[in-house]
């Protein structure tokens, strides 16, 4: 059911951080209500990229995406960037009206840059505002007790979103008391 109070959480895995030379290789999405209760999850989608794109990954990406199995999933995938965008957009539309939800996540500006370039329909569907959990992490480092949320950092898109939601709940209780 659509609600303007629902939140769109997206995480991308990419071949690197340079939006001009790197590509999206995985996308996942979760919809929560405003109290951060999960309403629905979209299965993570591995996006096909040719070998020459994967060959240009840096050492960190090669190691991490190989260890998680994502590199092989990308090679085996038949799903294009455009098809993945359409699937995620259809999922979001079921729960969130056009431009009513900020894009939510950790360091979400980086994901937003890739969405703007490679999945512009998702980028446009989200409100221009962003809810970046990393901001609260930094505020806690600067003004709080410095005790951070413990993350597993699996670098799997759906896991990363779940962790971002849990992290926001942690900081909501710790810093905001609301």
UniProtKB/Swiss-Prot annotation:
GO CC terms in record: cytoplasm
Active site, UniProt feature: 128
GO molecular function list: 3'-5'-RNA exonuclease activity; nucleic acid binding
Domain Exonuclease: 7-168
Keyword Nuclease among record annotations: yes
Swiss-Prot/TrEMBL keywords: Cytoplasm, Exonuclease, Hydrolase, Nuclease
Single Gene Ontology BP annotation: DNA metabolic process
E.C. number: 3.1.15.-
UniProt subcellular location: Cytoplasm
Protein's UniProt keywords contain Phosphoprotein: no
Primary localization: cytoplasm
Entry's family note: Belongs to the oligoribonuclease family.
PANTHER family: OLIGORIBONUCLEASE, MITOCHONDRIAL
Function of the molecule: 3'-to-5' exoribonuclease specific for small oligoribonucleotides.
Name of the featured protein: Oligoribonuclease
Source organism of this protein record: Francisella tularensis subsp. holarctica (strain LVS)
